[in-house]
């Protein structure tokens, strides 16, 4: 039986937490579906009791869009002073602190023993490539093949060309273990084309769909599409769901 190398927790939309051997990573948190019920709150991935004593907590925000960033993340320092923040340079904060690291496309940084490289996006901000505890993790942010039906043919071609150029650049990474990638239902019948292209070209060991809001049904459809390409894609049903890698 394969040893579990990471546990992935779906928070909401493009927000995920990943528990590796020695680290706890959070990507693109903007809200978490919980009620005021105390028992329910304790099921929350980011309930204070769950992370207050954790060491090596790294919080990533790929850009300043309201569905990828919430300044609430800085409140977590009140109950865990070990948190490190890795933020796209388009994110503005009131006061910089020693535990804030800002990064832009093509930059590479080591934050303690975690390697981070910023790749580009087809929207604002960046995508993240993270190497930690022997794993290589990619979070796309808003990098996607944004094929909107209402766009002109010329605009659609620009979107395709830009997207494929970013994926070509990412191919310099020879092996990605876990990748998080958008499957946005607003794109209608074209929701899957970016994820399918990404999967075929990059070949991650595990492909985790994101950026679908409340439309969890779309992850099942996407997983079925990816089966035809021999890429393992995850079906997500509910917030707080645990995925083992």
Please report, for each region that a protein language model flagged, where it lies by residue.
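Metallo-beta-lactamase
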Residues: 2-3, 82-135, 230-245
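Active-site-proximal beta-strand elements of phosphoester/diester hydrolases
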Residues: 7-10, 25-28, 115-120, 136-142, ...
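Binuclear metal-ion centers of metallo-dependent hydrolases, dominated by the metallo-beta-lactamase
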Residues: 9-11, 24, 99-108, 191-245
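Active-site environment of divalent metal-dependent phosphoester hydrolases
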Residues: 13-14, 33-34, 64-69, 91-95, ...
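Pre-active-site segment of Zn-dependent metallo-hydrolases
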Residues: 17-60, 71-76, 143-172
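Active-site neighborhood of phospho(di)ester-bond hydrolases with catalytic His/Asp-centered motifs
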Residues: 26-28, 55-67, 85-89, 138-141, ...
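Active-site HxH/HxHxD metal-binding segment of metal-dependent hydrolases
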Residues: 46-108
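Active-site-proximal loop/helix segments of hydrolase catalytic cores
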Residues: 122-200
